[in-house]
Amino acid sequence: MEMICVLFLSLVPAYSRGQGVYAPAQAQIIHAGQACVVKEDNISERVYTIREGDTLVLQCLVTGHPRPQVRWTKTAGSASDKFQETSVLNETLRIEKIQRLQGGRYYCKAENGVGVPAIRSIRVDVQYLDEPVLTVHQTISDVRGSFYQEKTVFLRCTVNSNPPARFIWKRGAETLSHSQDNGVDIYEPLYTQGETKVLKLKNLRPQDYASYTCQVSVRNVCSIPDKSITFQLTNTTAPPALKLSVNETLVVNPGDNVTMQCSLTGGDPQPEVLWSHSPGPLPPNSLVQGGNLTIWRIRVEDSGYYNCTAINNVGNPAKKTVNLLVRSMKNATFQITPDVIKESETIQLGQDLKLSCHVDAVPQEKVVYSWYKNGKPARFSDRLLITRNDPELPPVTCSLEIIDLRFSDYGTYLCVATFQGAPIPDLSVEVNISSETVPPTISVPKGQSTITVREGSRAELQCEVRGKPKPPIIWSRVDKETPMPSGTMTVETYDGKLRLESVSRDMSGTYKCQTARYNGFNIRPREALVQLNVQFPPVVEPAFQDVRQGMGRSVTLRCTMLKGSPMKVATSVWRFNGTLLAQPPAEQQDYSELKVDSVSRETSGSYECSISNDVGVSACLFQVSAKAYSPEFYYDTPNPTLSQKQSKNYSYILQWTQKEPDAVDPILKYRLEVRQLAQRNTIQTFIPVQKMEKGLLLEHILPNLKVPQSYEVRLTPITSFGAGDMAARIIRYMEPINYPSPTDNTCRFEDEKICGFVQDKMDNFDWTRQNALTQNPKRTVNTGPPTDISGTPEGYYMFIEASRPRVTGDKARLISPLYNITAKYYCVSFYYHMYGKHIGSLNLLVRVRNKRAIDTQVWSLSGNRGNMWQQAHVPINPPGPFQIIFEGVRGTSYEGDIAIDDVTLKKGDCPRKPIGPNKAVALPGSGVSAQHGPCLCGPLTFFLYVLLR
C-alpha cells in the first residue's frame, strides 16, 4: 500500500497548502572538529573551547528561502591577525592548526535578500600552556650593625597559558606551601605580564641549597599535560658577567675582517652567550662561534649595534653593546649664502659671503675639510674665516666666510673632504664665485604648464632653471598628500625634467617644482606649478545586465557613462549578436539608449553598446530574452527522505519555488533530469504545471533512489519561448530517523549525522564511519569487513581501528540519542563483524537516565567470529529514558578491527530463535525479569499509522 502511494505521488506534482514560502534567513552556529570543553555546563552554542594546534571547524546552519549566502567575520583578535571576509557556500569555516591569536568572536552572517540578515556569533577560546620560565634573583643585606649579612633568594616562575595556570613549587620531591616555615614564602607579584609566582627563600639556610621545580598545570584542560622546569640552587649560584675584546665604539674600513670577542667572567650555572644586531639580523657574511663574532669583508651596510648577551636565568642578563661604524663618505654638496645680516639674495661687492661644504660620512666627526682657491690652499686672514662646524647648517658642515667681498676674492674655490689615515677616497666639490654668479630663477616653458597624456603612456613634466650655478630641482605633489610614483614624497632631478612611466589616472593633479637650497644659493626656494591631466577610457554601467521580458513586450536598454576623461560621449555603437545596428547620432550626453519594440525569438540575444570618449572604448552588454528564471530549490523540507522497507531504496521530496514567474510568459512545465553521482546515465521526465505564482511552493517526489547513493538533480522551466535557466542541486541520502521515537527505525549510518549517535568524550579513541571507497588502502589485512552488510561498496558502517597508536584495553564508545520510554520491552538488533586473530570485545550497554546515569552491560562478545556479518538481538527493559552504548575494546594486537551496521531499536520482544551470546539482562530498578511474553505494540502501531495516513 505504501509503495503504491509513493509511486502515485511521484507522477503528480503537489503544491503547498499556503503561499509565499519566501522567508528571511535564520542561522545557528554549531561546532565540530577537535573541540574540547572545560566543564559540561559550559557546553553551549556560543563558546567553542579548542586546544592550540588543533583544527577549528564551525558550521553555520541556515534556513530561509531562497537559500541564504553565508559570510564569516571575526573580531577580538590580534591586530596582526587580519581575518578576511569570505563567502562560504557550504557554510563551513575550517582553520587548520589554530593559534592563540586566532581566538575571539566569530560571526556568521546569513542573508538571502528577504528581510534582515541573520547574524550569529560564537566565541572561540583557544587553550594553551607554554613552557615555564624560571629566573633566580639574589639580594644580600646587612643585619644588626653589619655584624653579618643575610642572603635572600627569589625564584620567579612565569608562564603564558589559557586558562590561568596553577603553580606548584617543589624542593626535591617535597611540595612547598605558603609560609610552611619561616624561611619560605610564596606570593604573586603585582604588575606582572603573564602569570607569575615567586618562591622567596629568606635568610638562606643550608637546607635551602637544593633542586627546585616549578610545575604549572591547567588541570588537564583539552588534555594539555602539566609542564615543569627545575633549577639547582647552590652556594656558587651567580648572575652572568661579560667583557669585550674591543671598544664600545669600533670604527673599521670597508673590506676589513672584523672579530669581536665576548668573554664570560662569571656566572653559575654556565651562561649562554648570544649575539644580535640592530637594526635587522646579523649580516650574511658573519659567523658566531661561542662568544666570538666574525664579519668577513665588512660592508658599509653592516654598520650598526652588535649586542652580546649572556643568560643563565640568574639575575638580569649581562649585555655588552658595540657600535660598529664602517667608514664611508658620499653626497658632497655646497651652499652659497649671501650676506645674512643684510638679508641679501645676491652676491655683491662690499657684503659678506659664506661658502659651505658638507659630506655624509661615517663617522661624521672624523671628516677633515680643506679649502683651496684657484688650485692653491686658501690663506686665512681677518677677511677669510673658516668655521669647522657651522652651527647654522647641518652638523659637521665646514664654512669659508669672506668678509667685505672684493673683486680679488673672485675665483674658483675647492672644498676637499678626507678621512686622514684611512683608505677612503677623498670627496671634493667646486664653487665658482664671479660677477656671473647669480641666484636661480625657475619657470615653466611655454606650452608646458598643462600636460595631457593618455593612461598607460609616458609623461614628462619640465621646469627651466636659470642662474649660476644651477641647483637641482625638487618635485612634489601639491593637491594630494600622496607619495610620488617612486614611493618617496619628493624626487630630485638635475635637468629640471620629471619623467613618469606608465601613468595612471591617480597621477592626475598639480605638481610643484622648486629649487634646492644646496649645490647653489642657500636662499628661499623658487617655485613653479605644472598640471598633469591623464585621460582614460570611459567607465560605464551596467557592465552586464540580464534583461527578461515576456514575448511581444518592449524593452529599453541604456548604457550610462559614469566617469572618464574627457567626460563626454563622443560616439556610441550598438551591435546585436555581433551585427552593427543603425543608430541615429546621439546628442552630447552621458548615456546611449536603444529600444527593442517587441521581444521575440528573433530579437532575443546579446546587445552590446560601445561608448567612446576619443580616448578609449568601454562596452555595456545586455542579454535580452524571454527565458524564465531558474527555479529556487527549497532546502528546509522537513524529513525529505522517505524509506521503503521492502527494498533498499528511498524516495526524496523535492520542493522549489519559481524565481520571478511574472517577469516572462507563464511556465508550462519543468524538465527534470536525475543522475546518480559517478554515473553518466540521466533519467529525464517532464512535470506539468497547473498553477504558478511568486512564492508558491512546488513539490515532486523522486522515487526508487538507491540507498545510500547521492544524485544530481537538474530542473529547467519551460515557457512558450522555450527552455529557461536550469538549477541544479545534489540530493544526499539522510537516515529517516525521527528520534527520540525510534520504533522500527534502522540506522544504517549512511548519513554523516549517524542518526544522532555521538562519540563518548571520556573514552580512548573514536568509532569511524567508512565504506569500501573511503577506507584506508593500507588498512591491516586479515581483519575488518570489506563492505557493509548490504555488500555494496557505497554502503557505510561504523568501525574501530586496532592499529597503532591503540594499545591493549583501549575503548571506543558510541552513544545513541536519548530515547523516551513508550513501551515496557525493547529489542536492540544489529549486525557485527569481528574477524581477526587479535579481536578484543564488543559490548552493548544501556544507560538509564533517572536521578543519575547508570550504565549496565546487557551483551558482550569476544574473540574471532569469522570474516562475515552476523546479527545479534538483545532484549532490554529500561525503567526510564535511556541510551544504548556500543563499546569496542582493543585486543592484544593490530589484527583486531571490529565493525557494526544496521542498528534497529524496536518495541516488543526479540525473535525467539537462539542467539549465541545474547542474553536478556534485567536493568537495575526495572523490577521485572528478562523473559517476557508478546505484546500488541506492533499491530497497534500499524493501526495508528493507517489512521494518520
UniProtKB/Swiss-Prot annotation:
Signal peptide segment: 1-18
GO BP annotations listed: neuron migration
Domain of life from the UniProt record: Eukaryota
PANTHER family: CONTACTIN 5, MAM DOMAIN CONTAINING GLYCOSYLPHOSPHATIDYLINOSITOL ANCHOR 1
Covalent lipidation (GPI-anchor amidated serine), chain numbering: S926
Membrane topology per record: Lipid-anchor; GPI-anchor
Principal subcellular localization: membrane
Span of domain Fibronectin type-III: 637-737
Keyword Repeat attributed: yes
InterPro entries listed in its UniProt record: Cell_Adh-Cytoskel_Orgn (IPR050958), ConA-like_dom_sf (IPR013320), FN3_dom (IPR003961), FN3_sf (IPR036116), Ig-like_dom (IPR007110), Ig-like_dom_sf (IPR036179), Ig-like_fold (IPR013783), Ig_sub (IPR003599)
Domain MAM: 745-912
Propiece residues: 927-949
A GO term from the CC aspect: side of membrane
Localization terms from the record: Cell membrane
Organism: Gallus gallus
Protein name: MAM domain-containing glycosylphosphatidylinositol anchor protein 1
Cystine residue pairs: C60-C108, C157-C214, C262-C308, C357-C415, C463-C513, C559-C609
Described function: Required for radial migration of cortical neurons in the superficial layer of the neocortex.
Quaternary assembly: Interacts heterophilically through its MAM domain with proteins in axon-rich regions and through its Ig-like domains with proteins in differentiating muscle.
Residues bearing attached sugar chains per UniProt: N42, N90, N235, N247, N257, N292, N307, N331, N432, N577, N649, N820
